[in-house]
Amino acid sequence: MANYFNTLNLRQQLDQLGKCRFMGRDEFADEASYLKGKKVVIVGCGAQGLNQGLNMRDSGLDIAYALRAEAIAEKRASWRKATENGFTVGTYEDLIPQADLVVNLTPDKQHSAVVQAVQPLMKQGAALGYSHGFNIVEVGEQIRKDITVVMVAPKCPGTEVREEYKRGFGVPTLIAVHPENDPKGEGMAIAKAWAAATGGHRAGVLQSSFVAEVKSDLMGEQTILCGMLQAGSLLSFDKLVAEGTDPAYAEKLIQFGWETITEALKQGGITLMMDRLSNPAKLRAYALSEQLKGIMAPLFQKHMDDIISGEFSSGMMADWANDDVKLLTWREETGKTAFENAPQFDGKIAEQEYFDNGVLMVAMVKAGVELAFETMVSSGIIEESAYYESLHELPLIANTIARKRLYEMNVVISDTAEYGNYLFANAAVPLLKDAFMASLQPGDLGKAVAGTEVDNAQLRDVNEAIRNHPIETVGQTLRGYMKDMKRIAVAG
């Protein structure tokens, strides 16, 4: 199999990268009716598999789970989750031949084996669904020409997909049809019905492409969503402790600081996040973020280049074939870091203190979000896609760190995201560790910025620069569809 994206000519590549249209709510007037009366079989019962299935069943669809025979015989976690929630569970041979839509929600590294196992069992004219297009785009999986291939990609972890649905809402979602596999022209109708069944139509749906989803998703998770948070956590903790801060306080400031800071980002973008700072601190955070962008732009561009070319995917798949040696080594090294092993702080940190004492962290968030967005857009990805894969998902990832530090983040995200995170963080830490971190001033981290005087003209120009960045323009529109999403709890 060959990387699908690399088989396209330049015009086709640019066309696929640039596919992105925000769909009107009137386009979902029929909601999930196109799939009602049809049999949907989900392969895989992890976080996305279970929670999408629960939502789809509650939307009136006929849902069953196909698991490997050994998972059923040994009553593994996937079997327990499906049966405990009252779903029909059977082997591939039992359920796949009956399915009108087979939804593959297994991890990326299992996709080829799963698809090669289920494809011969699928009936003529059935549909195959994904929530991430890596198998199609990067692996280049070939699907039978009578099978329709669609994607519905919620832009949240599976648990959030369920919680927002239970509240009568949903999470922003990307949908797509594989242009090589839409023999009956029904792919978009299937994808729309599936998205509506998960509740995604209530929060906003982008009609995208498999290519645009994969390339933007990989870029976001490697850089700002995971890699920047990991690098920022390790660098900030070590800096605080080296300057005499209590390790327990330093750990809590960072562990819960990302969540607190990005909650403001979620509600009002970079503008609101920066507005939570005093005027002198805002000017300092802006200056730091510009400095960071200058230093880190080549690293962001390298990751985007390697994603576009397929270099990243080929390297990761080589590690799959080598029993994940690199991934497991990097995971072990992360677990041994000082931040991960620091004592817990019993005291309370007020919400505003996270901003006042975390000016560097605010600057890192701003720089990372803007760089990821700018790099994606300059590579042909449309602004709406770039927004969802940079700013939108960041509070959700930060929330995982608040639960159990970097360990929890790396457990919750996919192995693909985790591998990319380590690649980025392992390059970013040495890039910033010496010259940049050594140049920090008192008030950048661990203590509030001293002084109250500001230059009005400078403050005016900085405010205008923040508010006029393209991610703020598109973000204001997209956040208008998400006002009903719940607030992430912020720890004290």
From Swiss-Prot:
Sequence positions that bind Mg(2+) 2: 217, 389, 393
KARI N-terminal Rossmann domain: residues covered: 14-208
PROSITE patterns: KARI_C (PS51851), KARI_N (PS51850)
UniProt cofactor(s): Mg(2+)
Gene Ontology biological process terms in this record: isoleucine biosynthetic process; L-valine biosynthetic process
Organism: Pectobacterium carotovorum subsp. carotovorum (strain PC1)
Binding-site list for substrate: 414
Residue sites binding NADP(+) per the record: 45-48, 68, 76, 78, 108-110, 158
Catalytic reaction annotation: (2R)-2,3-dihydroxy-3-methylbutanoate + NADP(+) = (2S)-2-acetolactate + NADPH + H(+); (2R,3R)-2,3-dihydroxy-3-methylpentanoate + NADP(+) = (S)-2-ethyl-2-hydroxy-3-oxobutanoate + NADPH + H(+)
Function: Involved in the biosynthesis of branched-chain amino acids (BCAA). Catalyzes an alkyl-migration followed by a ketol-acid reduction of (S)-2-acetolactate (S2AL) to yield (R)-2,3-dihydroxy-isovalerate. In the isomerase reaction, S2AL is rearranged via a Mg-dependent methyl migration to produce 3-hydroxy-3-methyl-2-ketobutyrate (HMKB). In the reductase reaction, this 2-ketoacid undergoes a metal-dependent reduction by NADPH to yield (R)-2,3-dihydroxy-isovalerate.
Residues of the KARI C-terminal knotted domain: 209-344, 345-485
Keyword Transcription regulation appears in the UniProt entry: no
Pathway listed: Amino-acid biosynthesis; L-isoleucine biosynthesis; L-isoleucine from 2-oxobutanoate: step 2/4; Amino-acid biosynthesis; L-valine biosynthesis; L-valine from pyruvate: step 2/4
Cofactor note: Binds 2 magnesium ions per subunit.
Residues annotated as the enzyme's active site: 132
GO MF term list: ketol-acid reductoisomerase activity; magnesium ion binding
Similarity comment text for this entry: Belongs to the ketol-acid reductoisomerase family.
EC code(s) of this entry: 1.1.1.86
Keywords: Amino-acid biosynthesis, Branched-chain amino acid biosynthesis, Magnesium, Metal-binding, NADP, Oxidoreductase, Repeat
Protein's name according to its UniProt entry: Ketol-acid reductoisomerase (NADP(+))
Secreted found in the keyword field: no
Pfam families the record matches: KARI_C (PF01450), KARI_N (PF07991)
Enzyme class: oxidoreductase
